[in-house]
Every structure is written in C-alpha cells, then in structure tokens.
Amino acid sequence: MLLLVRSRHSSVPRNSMLVRRLILVFLALFSLVVAPAVAEGQQSEQESRRVSDPPTLRRSLRGVLGGVPMTAADSMHQEIVRRLDFDSYKQLLLGLTQFGDREQGTPRNEAANDWIEDQLRSWGYETERVHYMFARRVGDVAEPREEVFATKVGASRPDEMFIISAHMDGRGGGEAANDDGSGTALVMEIARVLASSDIVSDRSLRFALWNNEETGLNGARAYVEQRAGMQGIEDPPGSGRYPEPTWIGMIQHDMMMWDHGNPVTHNQALDADVDVEFQLNSEMAAESAQLGLALINANRLHATDYPAVLSNAMSNTDSTPFMDLVAAVSLRENRRLYETGNRANPHWHQTTDLFETFSDADFMLGFNAAQTTLGAVAKLAGIRISR
C-alpha cells in the first residue's frame, strides 16, 4: 500500500504533468465560457469575479463529467454527509472568533473553552476535560491548563474509537480564524451532525479540541501521556463502559481554508485542494497511509468542490504525538513543511487572520474537508441512519 503513496514534492512523470496542465487549461476555458453568461445578468464586478472561484467551476465540471457510482452503504453515508451545513460551519467559526486569537493562558482562551463545551452540551453530548500543567520555559512555575472533548459512544464496539480533532488555541493578535478556528469549527460541525438521535455509530467517536498546540502540542501530548495506557479497559468491569476506547485512527484538522498558491494570489487557486498528510518516518506509517487513502476515496465520493491529495511529511500538528501509536493523519490547506512553512499563507500567526479576511471560496475549502472526514469516518466507524 505504501508503494502507492508519493509525496507531492517528488518528481512527477511527464504524462502526469501533461494531464495536470490539460486540466488547468480546461478549467480556464470553462471559466471563459461561463463568465460572460453571468456578466450578461448585470451582476456586480465582485459577483462576476466569483464565477471564476474554484467551487463554482468544480460544481459545473462535476455536472458535465458525472458522478461516481455508489453502493447502498455509500448512499447512506452521502445522506449523512449532506447534513453538514455550510452556513452552520461559518457560524461556528464566527462564534470562535469572538474570543480573539484564544491564546493559551489568557481569559479569552478560557472563555473559548467554555463556549466550545456549551455548544457540545447543547447538542446532547456529555463533555470531559483534560487537565494538565504547562510551563513556558524550563524553570518557570507550571500553570494549570484545560481542553475539552466529547464522545459519541459506539453501539456495538464501544471499546474502539476514532479521534476527530483540531486545536482551539491560536496566536498572532487577530482572531485565529484560520489557525485554527477553521479546524475547530469543522470538528464541531461534524459533532453537531452526528449528535442526531437517528444516527448510530458502531465504533465510538471522540471530538477533541486541543489546547496549547501553539506552544509545542502540549495539550495533545498531555492527552497521550494521561490516557494511552487506559485504552480498551472496561471500567467498572462488566459495565460496558470504556473511558478510553482503543484508538483505531486519529484525524487532525489544522488550518483549513487558504490555498491561494505560492506566489500567493488574491483568489483561491484553481488547483486548490485538501492536503492529507501522514508521517512516513513513524511506527504506524503503513496504517496511517491506509487511513489517508480512505480519506482520499471519501473525498472523491462526498466532497462537492475541492479534491484531496495525499503526502507523507506530516509535521508540527497535534497528530504528531499519536503517530507512533495509532494510524494518524492531518488534514490541511497546504502541506505543512513545503508550503505553509514557505509563506504560502500570509495571514499565518498575523493580525490579519480574521473572519472577514476569507471569502466563501476559502470557507468552502474547510467545509469540503469536513465532508471528506465525515465521509471516511462514516464508512470506517460504521455510521448509519436508524430508520
């Protein structure tokens, strides 16, 4: 399976490059056909420019090229994925931005944790908190920190679990809308959909919103340190309750909305995509690659606008502490090391990381990542609608 996985920065066969160029040419020609028709409707300049956004183009292309044949199970999973709501995703993200950048150790971080917990409880979840100590530097007095998670207990395999996560803290003095309000809102929107009383999951699902990612993945590391040894233990014996089900897979979401190319362009790039990363140099690389491929396949079936691609250099996010223990992947707007790390996002950790900075084409990239994750987990965890 690993032989099928190739990093996007490796050399590309000439025929693959030709196909890629032909696709881009086709997209450009398609925009030339559609844009004049819209302009005739006397729309504003901004509305006319929106026609060339990737979501509009890809929706039209899917209509031309046709869909992917689905099984009955795929169709049910599609019905579940369609319960995700774009406006709800945006409203959750907007709600998070009221707390500014949610920097760890600040009152706004604590208030955001409370708000996240209140939202999860309003959908019917019982929530828990991970408590840990954090010191900024060696020798500093450690201070208490907290992070929230909620669980949908599996109907037939409550002892096994997928972790769906993002980090709720940020920095930079803005609103941390993209880093990582976009991932946090994504996880919360999936949790909202799966809270419905008619949705059943065979395996347990945990929605974790990490704290202290920006200071070195401290919240996720604390979770692993405290709970890895608890996996699969029934407590009390015979109760059917598993405080920490055995980890089957871990899916992290970190910076989900900005793929404007590098050099950066004003609009979302025509070849924008959801990046799924695993770490080749990890103990669970083969299993992580398989999880990544499941997400790629789910994207092809369920995502409405943006494709997904797989690469093998996952880094600098909360799935890292898990990667030697369980299949672990990270979903992102760009590859972390080769694109984000090379200034592909000018708003990263800046005061401009604001809700108002992003367009619907940007929000849609994050929403398509939600479709991708929910579609994959629906199949892997055995999620279904009880009729």
Model regions and ranges:
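Alpha-helical metal-binding/catalytic segments enriched in His/Glu/Asp
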Residues: A150, I164-L217, T373
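Second-shell loop/turn segments in exported
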Residues: S75-L84, T97-E110, F134-G139, R171-D180, ...
